[in-house]
Amino acid sequence: MFRLFPLLLTASVLSACGHGDGSGIPQNAALEPTLASIQANVFTPTCAITGCHGGVATQAALHLDPGFSYSNLVGVPSSQGPNLTRVVSGDPNNSLIIHKLEETTPPVGAQMPWGGPYLPQSTIDVIRQWIANGAPDS
C-alpha cells in the first residue's frame, strides 16, 4: 500500500491539472492586456486551481493565485530550466509562458493548461500584449 501512495498522489495531482481547460474563463469578459484582467479572467479560473498553480503545493513552483502572480512570473527563471525566464518584460517571444501556452512541445514540460483543451489564441494574444507592454503590475 505504501508503495502505491506516491503513484496515487501523482495521478491525482496530474488529473486535477487537466481541469485548466479555459472553461472557467467568463465568455463575455472583455479581456484587457493588464495583469488585473488576465488574473481575474485567465489565471484565477484556469491556472490557480488546487494541484496546478494555486493553493499551497504548486506545480513547477509557480503560484498564480491573486497577489502572487506578478512576483512569480516577471523576471523569474523557470524552475524547469534556469536559462528560461517565465515572463521577459517587453519580450513575449522569449517568455516561457507564451511557449507553454502556444506550443505543443515547449522547451520544457508540456503545453498548458496540462492535458488541454488549451486557451484560445485570442486569449494568448492578450497575454502577449501585456508582456509586450512591459508586463506592468496592474
Outline where the language-model segments fall:
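Flexible coil segments in periplasmic/lumen-exposed cytochrome c-class electron-transfer proteins
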Residues: 121, 133-138
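Solvent-exposed helix-loop boundary motif
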Residues: 19-31, 36-121, 125
